[in-house]
Each structure stands twice: as structure tokens, then as C-alpha cells.
Amino acid sequence: MKAKKWLLFLAFGLVLSVLAACSGDKTKEPAGTKTNDTAEEKVLKFLNPEAIPSMDPSLATDESSFIYLAATMEGLYRLDEKTQPSPGIATSHKVSTDGLTWTFTLREDAKWTNGDPVTAHDFVFAWQRAVDPATKSEYGPYMMSGVIKNAEAINKGEAAADQLGVKAEGDFTLVVELENPTPYFETLTTFGTFFPLNKKFVEEKGNSFATSSENLLANGPYVISNWSSTSDSWELVKNKDYWDAKTVKMDKLTFKVVKDPQTALNLYEEGTVDRMDLTSDLVDQYSTNDDYTISADTFVYFLKFNQTKSEALANKNIRAALSRAFDKDALVGEILNNGSIAANGLIPKDFTPIPGSGEDFRKVSGDLVKYDLKAAKEFWAKGLAEIGTDSVELEFLADDDQTTKNLVQYVANQLSTNLEGLKVTIKQVPKKQRLALDSAMDYQLQLSRWGPDFLDPFTFMNLWTTDSGNNWTGYSSATYDKLVRDTVSTLATDAKARYNNFLEAEKLLFEDAAIAPVYQSSRAQLVSPRIQGVFVNPFGATYEYKWADVNK
């Protein structure tokens, strides 16, 4: 079925009420102007697409969690408005000549919201906890293995947590030993997994830690209020005990979970909220509105194939067929319609340049998996013959928001139509549940995504190594593992050689049809002119709220 016909089907079957209710009047007063602040209080109001899955820095794995962790906590450094590390709990650091020892000097005026000082011991505890296998952290091993000395051995149970290469020399000096020189380590320290934790508080709370506002401590710009693990609304309130509280202009930021696009639009137009994401069916109506903006990002969406849950998906030719059997250009142009672009590789466009030439990595690596129906059918026929069947049934797991619903229905229809004998059943669940099913490897086909945690291809490529804490697919390649691991070991100081390995590894990943790239996302939004100082990061926490202010 052609994309336009499928889109029309979706429009009539799924969002007819949205289209009927939207006027798209371009002459209206800009939305958001009706949200009035008192002279005593500055407030901005936002929507969130889902509940916050986790406020535990060791257990968080998703975009929403890291956004709110970054707002309420602070690590050694924080990304500024130019996406450069700026002083956080650390005021400065020194690096040894061999690049293996980093010594951080911490400020002495940083406090937790219970009045305790933030010390080097808090970082030692948090980092040890993140790699301790008893914690069952996904991100701890992913972010620290191969970077901090002994992190990998600890996570494998081959060394005790106190052998991690991090120690406190007094209360305000933190010394970190690395496995290999890591030039981007300063940037890593801005990420949520590296945030400190107050050991006494965490241990007192036990299993209740990070399950509600009352079971959290903050050391960052804001304190989260009126939140629990099942909340559909919460607030970020200015943390008056934050060491840099004078810089924080906002008194409060409010957030509400709204999944229905028409409800979100109504809230924006009546001035109840100051920002909302537009779904594809609304973009054309509002693209000339003064508040309309396209916010490009570096998230890449892909199909994950669980090779352990399906005989068909264990077959490389079947996976290769699925990867090529849906029209990605039509998907981004007509189903998403928000500035997103088709992804034909893993590393996003305009993310990182090749050392020496300065060319964009994506351009040099090229299109590795394009829509190719002829090739898809050939791979499909070969795969079916190899597994001895003429039909395959797959369950397609995805989040339950409206945009994702439109997307997965389109992809499922394309796959079922283009590959004879294939039946795809869609299973949509809340994001928190999808993440749990993902880590339990309780799925067959899944729409997933990844946003970079730091500015290096390793943040994407390490996902698919055999022992990665995020590789819940069953994919394993010793050749791929070595290519990626060498970039942080034997080739750590040879920039050109590292990137050659990344190029070769990305090519191998798609020759093996480990995953199927779908698109690199953008956000089409309506943003009130009231908002200023809210920065969008290309890696790490998507939104930075420390410098938020109201434009009167």
C-alpha cells in the first residue's frame, strides 16, 4: 500500500477527530501568553509524553529519566548553553601526562537538600554502586566498563566494588584512574550515571529510594515535588540550597503527562502549557504559526530483532529482508512529517566529524541499509527456504503514544504487504513496560531508539557488543566486539585509527542485519515566546533547565 493511502487510512481510522477539531488559525494571538505569573513567582508549564520511569541515577536508562535527573542533580560538570562542560560540583581538574589519572577538586559549598555537604565520598559510593552486579544497572557497566579501572571486572563478579578506580582523598578531592586514555571523560562526567549519591540516605531508604519525592535528595538546580513512580504530573521547584541558586531564575516548572495530541494542542492554545510536540497530522496546519519550530536531535530509531525469541529472527536473511522492506522516505515525509530524516546507518547525521578530514561520519560511512523491495524479497525467499517454512508470525513491540502508533502501523503494514507469508501483530505498551520487556528480552520485533550520551561514536557502537548492558538482542560477533573494544584500548590515542574501526564496525553491524535503522528524529513543536534559556542538548539530557527564564 502506498504511503499516502496508508496515511489517509490512519487519518480516518485514528485521528479524524483531531483533524476535525483543529482550526490551525494563523491569525491567532501566540499561544502561551495567557499563562500569567505573579510578581512573586516565575512558572513555566510543560507536557511530558510519559511518566518518569526512574529517578535512580544507577537504574535510569531513558530520555525522560535523564532529563529530570539533570534538573535535580549535578555531577562533576554540567553542559552549558554551548554544550561544553562547565563547573558543577567540580571546580577544576588535572590530568596526568599518560592520560590515566584524573584529579578533580570539588567545591566546598555544595549541599544535599538534607543539609549534608556533597563530597568526594558521594561520587565513590555512586560509581561503585553503578557497576556492582547486585545493583543490576544497565548504564553503569555500559558507561564505565573499559573506561574506569576495574569497572568491567567488578560487573563480571571478578573483583570487589571497592576495587573501582575511584577514590576520595579527603572530602573534596576525587581521584579517578582510567583503564585507557579517554579524551571525552570530562564530558562523561556530565551524564546522569556519574551523579553522586548520599550513601547514608540511600541505605536508610532501602527499596524505597527514588520511588517518590520524599525518597529523593537533590543537589542540583531544582527539587522534584509531588512525584511518585506512577505520577502523571509533577513539579520542579527551585532548590534554594543549590550552590548556584542565584543563577536559577525560575521558581517552578510544572509537568503533566498527556499522550493525546488534540488534548495537548488544546492546552497549548488556551495558554495552559508553554510547549507541545506536534504530531504529523497537525504539522501542515501550524507550520506557519509564529510559535512553530523544528528541533533537530540526534536520536536514531531502529528495529531490534530478538534472535533468541524467534527462529525466523535468528536467520540473517530474514532480518536483512525486514530491514529493507519498508519505505523510510515515505515514513518520515508523510507519516512523521516533522523534519525527521530516514536513517540508513546507526551514527546520526551531523553528529561527529572524521578526524583529519572533518567530513561528517554519516556522509563517509554512507547509506548501509536502504529501502530496496527487490533485495528484500530475495532475502526473504532465501531465509524462508533456510528455515523450512512459507510463513512467519511476529509480534511488534512499541510505546503507546499516538505518533508511535501511526508509525508502527505503517511499518507493520509495509512489512506484511511486501513480504509474502508474513503476519505482524502490534503490541503497544507504556514506555516503562516496554523498557522492562526489552531488558527481559521478552519481545520479538521492537521499535527502539538511542540518543548519544557523549560526543563520540562509541556511545552508539558499544551498544551491540556481546556483553553490553544494553544489547538485548542475542546478537554476538567476536569481530565486531574487537573492532569496537580496540577504539578504547589499543587505539585509544590514535583518532584516525579509532574512526576507521568505527566505520568498519558499522558496516559489519548491518551486513549481519543485527538491527534495522529507521529514522533520525526531529521534533516539530509549538513553543511559547515566554520561554527563554531552555537549551536542547545534542547528547546527554535532552533539555537543560538550569538557565530557564520567562521572557516578559
Each predicted region: which residue ranges?
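Ligand-site clamp/hinge motif
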Residues: 239-285
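Structural transition elements
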Residues: 342-382, 403-405
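N-terminal lobe/hinge region of extracytoplasmic solute-binding protein
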Residues: 47-97, 217
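Ligand/substrate-recognition segments at binding pockets and active sites
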Residues: 229-231, 373, 377-452, 523
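Gly/Pro-rich hinge or "lid" segments in bacterial periplasmic/extracellular proteins
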Residues: 178-248, 252, 262
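Long beta-strand-rich cores associated with HINT superfamily self-processing modules
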Residues: 525-552
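Surface-exposed binding/hinge segments that line
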Residues: 138-200
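Extracytoplasmic/peripheral linker and loop segments enriched in polar/acidic and small residues
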Residues: 368-369, 421-434, 461-528, 552
